[in-house]
Amino acid sequence: MAKKSIKVVVEGGNVKPGPPLAPTLSQLGLNVGEVVKKINEATSQFKGMTVPVTLDVDTDTKKYEVSVGVPTTTSLLVKKAGASGPSGDPEHKKIGNISMDDVIEVAISKKPSLTAKELKGAVKSILGTAKSIGLTVDNKDPKLVVREVEEGKYDDKIKEMEEKWSSG
């Protein structure tokens, strides 16, 4: 019973039956159209977002399982801002504004892939991504918001969400 895992990053609900996925699936003897349909169904809630997908294939029986990961931090932030994509020039061209609550929600949803041990550290990491893609947070530069987080300005808000972080 040989197993093979295929890891791909796809646009949620919009996988096409072409390269790079199709040749790999064909080599394993899988029905490309069927697999693409299953991936699109599994990722439909993340439409327009970049999502990691793992396909676990039993090469003997040709049975497979689709596992969907958490979308990228950039995708989650862009969606929260209602923007079409990250800024090519984040210092001069802002793509939108999000709230500190949005930042905390993204931090909690990304917990499995972050190295931060505490929510406060995760929030600072998400703020760094927000800055790099041209977002403001509560109408301020995320770098300033990081400083405010370090000074304790958001401690009450972060403490409120610690339970969600711990159980996640």
Curated annotation (Swiss-Prot):
Disulfide-bonded cysteines: none
GO biological process, one term: translation
GO terms for MF: large ribosomal subunit rRNA binding; structural constituent of ribosome
Xref: Gene3D superfamilies: Ribosomal protein L11, C-terminal domain, Ribosomal protein L11/L12, N-terminal domain
UniProt-listed InterPro entries: Ribosomal_uL11, Ribosomal_uL11_C, Ribosomal_uL11_C_sf, Ribosomal_uL11_CS, Ribosomal_uL11_N, Ribosomal_uL11_N_sf
Source species, domain of life: Archaea
SUPFAM superfamilies the UniProt entry points to: Ribosomal L11/L12e N-terminal domain, Ribosomal protein L11, C-terminal domain
Protein keywords: Ribonucleoprotein, Ribosomal protein, RNA-binding, rRNA-binding
Pfam families linked: Ribosomal_L11, Ribosomal_L11_N
Cell division found in the keyword field: no
Cellular component, GO, one term: large ribosomal subunit
Family named by the database record: Belongs to the universal ribosomal protein uL11 family.
Protein role: Forms part of the ribosomal stalk which helps the ribosome interact with GTP-bound translation factors.
Subunit field text: Part of the ribosomal stalk of the 50S ribosomal subunit. Interacts with L10 and the large rRNA to form the base of the stalk. L10 forms an elongated spine to which L12 dimers bind in a sequential fashion forming a multimeric L10(L12)X complex.
Name used for this protein in its record: Large ribosomal subunit protein uL11
